[in-house]
Amino acid sequence: MRQYEMLELEWKGAKPEGSWVDIDLAGEFSCDGIITKVKGFYGGDGIYKIRFLPERSGHYTWRIKGIIEEEGEAFCEKAAPAEEGSGKAAFEGTGHGMVRTRGMHFVYEDGSRYTPVGTTVYALAHQPRPLIEQSMETLSRSPYNKLRWCVFPKSFPYNENEPDFYPFEKKEDGSWDVHRPSMAFWEHFEGILRRLEDMGIQSDIILFHPYDRWGFCEFSMEENLVYLDYVLRRLSAFPSVWWSMANEYDMLMKRGMEDWYEMEEFIAANDPYHH
């Protein structure tokens, strides 16, 4: 266990009988009297996980509650000292923590300076595998240390293909079932996220957008919150993640400002690390 690097706990059990999102699994991690509460998630094939991002070094104890009852402890080693420089090569991997603000500037949690040099590849996760690999190779040789990309597929000129995976399974009537995340999709999405992290690239994840022909823009508020709940349970412990509520939010005509405020408040209340 090392400071700023995600800890993952895993258990095998029976498949959930109801929702695959709203599962009764949570953990409390304590160090020096500071307690962080996190929710677990279902990862498919009877696998349940809890992920935790230790932001300080020292002796940790934890208690798991819900469908799993367990206690544990471990010593978290201190991260290596911060190094000078802000180039991408200096920050490959996850050992510097999340990016925070300091005055008018950005810094990693270990105090290292972060100067964002970003680009967008909105439909990165939804392209054919050869194009994904070409894009990743290009990014690995680029100066970019921040990438904006989407959870939902994009319907737009040059992005007209059908993805191999979608974020959810479908119901018998053909509508999306937000309570049944597609594990193939989320494993695929995470694989890209981890590779970007290893390159020293921060992921500015766009949660909503209007470039849709599949019906994701038609979700009710209840469905949106279920979707966000799974995203937060599964991805919040990645130190390289940033949340971007939407691209061109004002083109999502079914959403008023109060809806956006509600979803923002939900994210703030359910992200234990406040990305």
What do these predicted ranges mean?
Residues 28, 34-103:
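Extended acidic/polar, glycine-enriched regions
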Residues 17-18, 53:
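Short, solvent-exposed beta-strand/turn "edge" segments of beta-rich domains on protein surfaces
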Residues 9-17:
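Short amphipathic, basic-aromatic surface patches that mediate peripheral association
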Residues 95-275:
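Active-site mouth of glycoside hydrolases
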Residues 17, 30, 40-42, 137, ...:
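Generic marker of residues within folded, mature protein domains
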Residues 1-6:
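Solvent-exposed, conformationally flexible loop/turn segments
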Residues 19-24:
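Short coil-to-beta strand junction motifs in C2/discoidin
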